[in-house]
């Protein structure tokens, strides 16, 4: 991004994601403003239309050319910057392809485990694998509260031995990776799960802050995960 800011500082205004599919395709072919000006509007439109699957067309092509015309980026060592930008795009594309392969492998391994964890709202193959990897053998935990504590999602008690108000802090002990995975899943479940979304809304209606409510849903989700793994039965929302 630093290199791109030097040669085409206005570029970030053209795409919401500089390293999105369409932007990467554009930069891999035309890394500098002058390159974008040299190509015909028709050819540029075709590239954008194909890369974005029809989302961008001649309007975006004209906008890019307009920005490129008015750009005040540096004008020296162009060949060096062009090479560097192309190399960065190639490296990003390679890493993304490796991640896709890794995700496929994770999905395949998860299938061999025959785990019911992905039946829980918000937990897909990647989060499921992360959670299982951090928990290990569920028999290590005798009760759900132990799993909650292991994830560091239990409520921190203040010095007076009480917790009050609309904001409750979690202890953040235990596995940060497990906590993060469950938190992500809980955030999704707050709006997607038939039962947990109702619970989340009740907390909000009572004046709880969003993060406090998500934390409460995350603790509920720990209980659900514990039950699903212990009983080896799929999750069914209890409305």
List where the protein language model places each region.
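A detector of single, family-specific signature residues
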Residues: 1-239
